[in-house]
Amino acid sequence: MPTPKIFESEYRFCLILWEHEPIKSMELVKLCREKLDWSKTTYTVIKRLCERGVIRNENAIVTSIISKEEAQMSELEEMMDKKFENSLPAFIAAFGRKQALSDAQIEEIRRIIEG
C-alpha cells in the first residue's frame, strides 16, 4: 500500500506530532497554536490525516501511523521520479551545484553509497 501524500502544512503538523507522540489531542492543539499559529485548523488536519491513514486519534490520544522516515522516503521517491527520472547521479549533481558540499558531507555520501 503506498504511503499517503502528506502536504506541506500537514508535514509541519506531523513534525510536532512525531516529536511529542503519543499526545492528547488538546495538547496537540495547544502546541500547534504556539508553533504554527493554528487554532481550529488543527482539528481539521487531525480529521483529514486520520481519514487518509496517516495518523490515528483514539480516545483523544493522537499517534502516527506513518513514521517520519516513511513520509520522507515517500516524498523523496516522488521527487526523484518526477524531477530526476529516478537518477541518483542527476539528483546528487543538481544538489551539489546548488550547495557546496563539505569534505565531511562528501565522505558521508560515499559511505552511504558504498553500503
Model-derived segments and their meaning:
Residues 11-17, 92:
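Hydrophobic residues on short alpha-helical segments
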Residues 36-51:
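Short amphipathic alpha-helical interaction segments
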